[in-house]
Design a protein with these regions (language model features):
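Hydrophobic transmembrane alpha-helices that form the pore/transport pathway of multi-pass ion
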Residues: 126-181, 192-195
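Intrinsically disordered, low-complexity non-transmembrane regions of multi-pass membrane transporters
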Residues: 4-8, 14, 44-78, 226-258, ...
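Interfacial loop-to-helix junctions that mark the boundaries of transmembrane helices
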Residues: 1, 21-26, 53-62, 75-92, ...
């Protein structure tokens, strides 16, 4: 049965890697692999428990004064094997949920509008490198998926040419993935390694610094040659914030510092308290939430906070990403227990 479960996991990885070909959502595949794997595990639980957890199972029987039956095995698996795996998965999911909510609060209050001001140029090279550098730096602090969606949405509203959009979009994707890979909070994979204690935040970043810079700079230099001297742009007037937020520049800057600075503080929080990183992320979220309530107090009292500017693709994509991470952690967990 171990071979069957392992085969399911391998097939799931293949389907995830070929998502563009199969058109099957990777989150659905991950959730299916995780749930089916655990169902098979508990159906043949006696073999796995006696081979991998015999001492723990014996102590469980002695403590609970139960006989070794299929029911007691299932109870042992659900309480002492399955729940710890769910706990590990929940830690990652809660961290992602907290950080993505932080991004939503910042985005709704216009804290990233400064990026549009930096992009006011007709030079294609300057536009390319500004997009790439800003995306790289933001993805270091936020997760790469959220950064990609946010920057692509912004770029799409500025550049009308389809061909130029493809080049700038590719640069954004490369920068977001390389920036996200540089820190433990930049992508789910690094977060899983850090949360499991396999790496430390400092060693992780220093080890990947040169590879990430090379993987980012070399493709961007090559893409630079594909652009004309001048870039075609169209600037849409910034939307009136009467129904969204009335924060001034300094209030937005303060919220940005609280959000981004708080995310940077999470590794320190983990090292000092030894508590799970998601608790630090929730702490940052709560502080930012309070600041948001204070700054928008008058607007909330007027019941005017009805329009949100977060792209729908981001909202739907966040749910998919969380389900995908949850499914993959459960799938890997069941293989680990076999």
């Amino acid at each position: 049965m171990t071979l069957v479960i392992l085969t399911i996991l391998i097939l799931a990885y293949v389907l995830i890697a070929t998502e563009n070909v199969t058109k099957v959502n990777r989150a659905a595949v991950a959730i299916f692999a995780g749930t089916v794997g655990w169902v098979l595990y508990i159906c043949f639980g006696m073999d796995f428990v006696t081979s991998e957890h015999s001492e723990d199972y014996t102590r469980f029987l002695n403590f609970s004064e139960m006989e070794s039956t299929s029911t007691s095995v299932k109870y042992f698996i659900s309480r002492h094997i399955f729940l710890p795996q769910v706990g590990r998965a929940a830690e990652i999911v809660m961290f992602l949920l907290a950080t993505m909510t932080i991004v939503e609060i910042l985005n709704n209050n216009g804290c990233f509008d400064f990026v549009r001001q930096l992009l006011r140029t007709r030079s294609s090279k300057k536009m390319l490198w500004t997009l790439a550098i800003v995306t790289f730096l933001i993805s270091i602090n936020l997760d790469n998926f959220t950064t990609t969606v946010m920057m692509l949405t912004m770029m799409h509203s500025i550049i009308p040419s389809r061909r130029q959009r493809m080049v700038y979009g590719s640069a954004i994707l490369v920068a977001a993935n390389c920036g996200g890979a540089l820190t433990v909070i930049g992508n789910p994979e690094g977060l899983v390694l850090w949360n499991s204690g396999a790496v430390t935040a400092t060693v992780f970043s220093f080890s990947l610094l040169l590879p990430c810079l090379a993987a980012w700079l070399i493709p961007t230099l090559l893409m630079q040659r594909m652009l004309p001297e001048r870039v075609e742009t169209e600037w849409i007037v910034m939307p009136f914030r009467g129904d969204d937020t009335r924060l001034n520049k300094w209030q937005r800057l303060l919220m940005l510092l609280v959000g981004i600075g708080g995310l940077w503080f999470i590794p320190t929080f983990h090292n000092i308290t030894k508590l799970s990183p998601f608790l630090g992320a929730l702490c940052v979220l709560s502080v930012l939430w309070i600041v948001n309530e204070i700054f928008n107090r008058k607007l909330m009292n007027m019941d005017a906070m009805v329009e949100r500017r977060t792209p729908r693709v981001l909202q739907y994509g966040v749910v998919q990403m969380i389900l995908f991470v949850m499914g993959m952690i459960l799938a890997v967990g069941v293989v680990k227990e076999t």
